[in-house]
Amino acid sequence: MSTRSNIIIKNGKTNILLYRHCDGYLVGAGQDLHNDLSNSDFEQEPYFDNIAEYFNIAKFTEKLLKQDTDYRIDNQFGGDIEYLYTFEFEDGYEHEDHYNRVKLKSIEVDQEHEYGRGGKNKYKSLSEFQDAINKARKENE
């Protein structure tokens, strides 16, 4: 049986809802989402403060949607999902070079949504999210 999940990408009032049919658990979809976001950071430039906090939201979304067999845009939650991932960002625009620059506010993983049985957890950084994935990986060994 597949482990289905939804992903919400929030930036202000804009929400993008994605669906993933298989491997929705932390060491599957969670790790993939972590990797795609970490590979969507802004290039390091001397005038940026805290560069690791800023990401290119367009690049992140594009990485997910290019995976034709993994993610699709949806207009409603899946009926039997076990994981709901919510990536919340705030705008990081300063000038024209920053049109898609955002700062990560939080990543929430809801395993209680519909059919999940694992509770809700909120992470304030990508490294906290990776720690949770690593913990889940160890528990499954």
Each language-model region and where it sits:
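Short beta-strand scaffold segments in enzyme catalytic cores
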Residues: R4-I9
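Active-site beta-strand-loop-beta-strand hairpin of nuclease catalytic cores
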Residues: N11-N15
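Short, solvent-exposed aromatic-acidic interface loops
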Residues: L17-G28, D110-Y115
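Cysteine protease-like catalytic core of ubiquitin/ubiquitin-like
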Residues: A29-H34
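Low-complexity intrinsically disordered segments
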Residues: N35-E141
